[in-house]
């Protein structure tokens, strides 16, 4: 994947559930978008601090920390799936229960800074993996 741009996938290339997410991605180079998003996320969330990171807008809703944990979990899952596609592994990919994962996470006990550090390291690893894919992948 030496190119920094990819064509937007055709509707038949992803489950209809993801159509809204795909539509939200701006046009542009993949790596630049991923890098900009990482910077923007850090700039938005780091100033919140620890007390605000525990905020829930309603009972039984995720805190900001838990949302960040979910972002990290999702990036891990989708990066793993991208690796499987790149390696032409045809084994069926199971889904995952994000609600169960949220119930069993330790995001609420971690500091906001550690969660954001983890998210940044994870994005750096994602970019490294994607840059390492051959064009044919």
Report the location of each language-model feature.
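Aromatic-glycine hotspot motif
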Residues: 1-64, 76-137
